[in-house]
Every structure is written in C-alpha cells, then in structure tokens.
Amino acid sequence: MEVYLSEFINWKLYEFKKINELGTSTFRYYFKGKIVNLKNKRVSSNEVCYMFKLMDDTGIVELNYSLSKYSPKFEMLRQLQLGISVFVYSDVVCRVSGIRAWKLQIHSKNLESKIEATISEPEQIPCPGFGSDNIVPLSLVNDFKDGAFVNVLVAIQWKEEFEIFNNETKKSLPKQTIHVHDISGSAMIVLIGESQVKSALSWNNETILLIHNAIAYRTNTGMLELSIKDAIIQTLQSFDGKVLKLLNFSIKRKELIKINAYRLSTLEALEKIASQSGEAFGQVGVLIMQSKIKDLTKEGGLVYGNDLTGLRFADLISIIVDETGSVKNPKFSQKLLEEITNIAPTELSVLNEEQAMHLENVFLYRHYRVCVGFLNKQIYVFSSDEPLKSYI
C-alpha cells in the first residue's frame, strides 16, 4: 500500500488488515481504498449514514460514515460511485463485535474525520465501457441489495442440462442454468428463452466471461444469481489486445483466474468434507492473522537445533482466516514458512525481540494462496509444490 504524507505528516497510515486488528481506541489515522460496495440509509429526518466497503492490496475494511444532509460534505458523498478511490481520515475507531462484524465508525461532527475522493469519477474504459476498478468479486456481490447492477469477471465451472420453463403466460421456453466462479465465490446464471440459451451454446469450462450490468439476486436457498437480460458480455475469445491492455489483464492472469475458479476452496468447505470423510485437501486463499513469535522469543523458544524446537517452528503461526472462518494452531511446513518469512529456522536463533517483531510485521495480515490439509483432527498448511506426506 502506498504511503501518503505531505500535509498529513502527523497522521498514521494503516493497511486495512492492521486496522481490522485495532481495538477500541482514539487516535489519528488515515488510509486510501477503492470503493467496492456502497449503501446509504436514513438514520433520522436530518441524518444519513453511508456504509462503505473499501479495498486495498491487503484486504477489505468496512466503514460507516454518518452526517447531516445539511452538511457541506453531503453533496460530495452523493457523487461517490463504485470504483472511486478515496482517502479516509479519522480520529475515532470503534469495534462493534467480533472479528468479522466490526466496522470503523466516523461522524462528520468529528472535525478530524472526513472522506475525500482522490479522483472526480471512476476511470472509464471504452469497449465495453467499464474498467477493472469496477469489477466486483462475487464474495462482495452477496452484500449488494437484490436488483443491484454489478460488473463481474467469472469462469464457467459447469452447465446444467436444458429444461423447459413455463412463464406467466404459460408459454414454454428453454431454460439453462450455468454455474460460474471467481477466486472469491460462486454464482449461477439462469438463461431463459431461445435467444439467451443460444448465445451460450459455445460456452464451456474453458470460457471466461466479463459481464457488465449483470443484475444480482438471491434465490430462496441463498444462492447468488446473476441475470444477464440487459448485460453486456465479452467472452475470453472476444477480448482484443487494446481492451486487455486497458483492463490490465495479461494472458497469465486470465489463466490464473480460470485455475483459481476450479481449484480454490475455503476453510469451511474443507472442514465439512473432513467431517464426513476424515480428511480433506485443497488450495485456499488465507490471511495470517496471528503468530506466536512474540511468546516464543520471550521464552527463548526460537532456537532451532533439535526435533522439539523444529516442531515449535512449525507451530509459529497461531491463526489463519479466510472469508468463511478461521483455523487455530495450524501446522505449517518448514518450506512454506521459509518462503513466507524469508528466513531459515536456524537464523531465528540469533534474532532479538525487536528483530522478531519486525519479522512478524513482514508476514502478518498478508494474503497467501496455500495448500491446506485436514487430517487426523490436525490442520496442515504447505506450499503447492511440496507433497503433504513429506513432512506429516
């Protein structure tokens, strides 16, 4: 995350995942993030609360900003849109409840609390008329109200068989459901009518779709559904070089999206599989939230020289999380820990407490794509290019 100082030299800049670890306190801080979700509600006849989800390279933070409709800042907030980058300045932070439920709360009455847009409007990209700033992960689309228009980039996982659908006029129409994924979640696209079904005949599990103005709904079972009735759709084959360059998507990145859509799992899904079959393995995007490096440094337990201390190195990470839950005390492979910390266990023996704290700052609150194994009531974490049984 970029560091901005200039006239705000006395303000602290926090990456989002560090903000999410702060307790209830009062201090000055500021950060920059991209708006990926935006709602508002009337609190009283004269007060409105804007509810944001802001994203940077380290994660997502939620923010509630309350202000009077007579405030000079009110008109600026009305003009904010998805994709705009904003600065947030505040001297107040408040934890509501739980690691996944709390939000930053600021009010325009706090003179040191404000939101400023860094650009007047989101970047607009020609052909098809929107940019990567406006592409929303499916995990965030779940927070949108039913009927919201969204832009998504998804890979097809599978297509269901054709059905016959009877509409309100009892006219029989062809219907097909297509399941799609991105690296954060899943959804389904329901095609109704001959023209929609025909348009998707060439789609298969190699197809990636860039969809502009899909309409998001929740089904009775809670599944996310995307209506493409009024959408603009580009398939992988129709991306030309100019659009790819403007959207900042390389061929390699498209391949990663496709691979992630098929293979990326969640901690919750693996836990459910393990509860039924006794074991489960998959690739998961996780965030390292807590380590034992502070405690082990004080105990002198970072010295590496025998099996016991080697095991303690494997126990270095206390908590990992993804969007579905958390895991305590996972066993990390030595190879993966060396990749993450960029230090060998033998080098840990010469670190003092201050150096150990600095090392912790290198890997905490960072996203990693790792392999996770649930086996014999233990959770193992390892890199994708090493066999699990090499260290269990």
From Swiss-Prot:
Which GO cellular component does the record give, naming just one?
cytosol
The biological process GO terms on file are: reciprocal meiotic recombination
Chief place of localization:
cytoplasm
Instruction: List localization entries.
Output: Cytoplasm; Nucleus
For this UniProt record, give its keywords in alphabetical order, as a comma-separated list.
Answer: Cytoplasm, Meiosis, Nucleus
Q: Which GO terms describe its molecular function?
A: single-stranded DNA 3'-5' DNA exonuclease activity
- Task of the protein: Has a role in meiosis.
Q: What is this protein called?
A: Meiotically up-regulated gene 11 protein
Q: Name the source organism.
A: Schizosaccharomyces pombe (strain 972 / ATCC 24843)
Which gene name does the record give?
A: mug11
